[in-house]
């Protein structure tokens, strides 16, 4: 996992260079960010001698009890169709089989929250669908109904003082590449102002969480960043101090605090939100009372980044359960005159209500017999653009259009009812979405992996099952050709890690405490952006979880490795086939899979394949 983290950081090294080249004056608009991917991997495939693997003892993850209400489960798994429409009911074929895997006493820590929020989300979605149906039947379809996820929102000329004001509403949240540009003038008579990203309400909480609080204090110049939830209160403050060295930690290859401003200090806040005093060099402080500034807050893969007048000032890593897709509003308090604020690159779907959907973009019908390959694409609610890029690119391979290969998106519900309504429209239009009966959280990805195994053994039986992500490009032709040379059973195929250890650094996205995995290393596992298992392994996973012989684990790709290790020792020797043409972090010619591709790059790769018939990278 450490190798994976270094790869992610390397990717964003180019972003930081581009950020330093920005020239942002006092104006309303700033340049949007371009994420560029560069890595290197050589092409090599080999089959591993697994005799040593077979002899290792099986270790199961530690089991912790987490409970949810039966009422929520009963609602989510009631017999009636929520939608009453065959097209969307077909998107719940896995959903209907998931209950036994959710109500186990050793469920993943976030399962209860994910199910509670899914119940609220589903109730809201049913109301939205019924409201839209009434609007269509009465002929009163407004632009608001047709376009509920705008690609940008803006506001101008607001004089804020004292109480907190909602500056912008963000109907469908934020995603990687989104940015918020604010032009303002601090009040000469005020000692501070705050910019807050407020989230959708969490289950069981009456007050909305603060996904990010950016507190600017003039009395003793400071920039303090933090989060807040009703349940946990304020988290650990992160603030700059002029004297001392920087912490050796980066977010998207950017420092937590600009070296010219100071060093970062992390301390626990008191619940009364008292700002701790610190000393900063006034000369380097990016804000000045009475002087206008342009602030660009943008969203990377790992965290938030703030640029003031063209200079990167602070970064703040996303905290668990407080992801950017939860953000629903921008609030400002304190003394600040707002000249303009603009949120751009927001998640938007295609307007399915006004466009005639091309037949070639719809999921083709299947014969009902076992297919060669099922590809499960892990996606989240507001990643509309990514899914459309896949539908218009590698999902157009003849093997997919003919039904030899099936591709399905596995998506959990969203806490935002508008995003869920757009997903409902999307599912109805394309027929390639399988909904999950929980709200998407990183800690629940392993449940999606189990769901994919159910899909590939019970719903769309397939000889091979592949897991990939919605920012990956897959060469279906090369993959099928390679699988012809592989065994049809007891197979794990992809970019395999044979010597990795748990990340013990608290705060890391991949942090695993010793009580969850006490060993110093993991069994062999294939990197999550793309791996293939045989039908018998998928069947073993489903049966093992139904009978609760297999434990759940937070990291889905490592979890699959743990389950396969048990298959290897109890059922049949596994062939671990490592193929370095599965690029989990870069693009290199002669690839089978490349990860971290934007929608633009996905379409570019497809165009190059069509024109040149070669797997050539775009950048």
Curated annotation (Swiss-Prot):
Bilayer topology annotation: Single-pass type II membrane protein
Tissue expression pattern: Expressed in juvenile leaves, stems, cauline leaves and siliques.
Compartments, record wording: Golgi apparatus membrane
Segments crossing the lipid bilayer: 21-37
Residue ranges annotated as Cytoplasmic topological domain: 1-20
GO molecular function, one term: carbohydrate binding
Glycan attachment residues as annotated in the record: 79, 217, 568, 613
Protein name: Hydroxyproline O-galactosyltransferase GALT3
Organism name: Arabidopsis thaliana
Name of the gene this protein is made from: GALT3
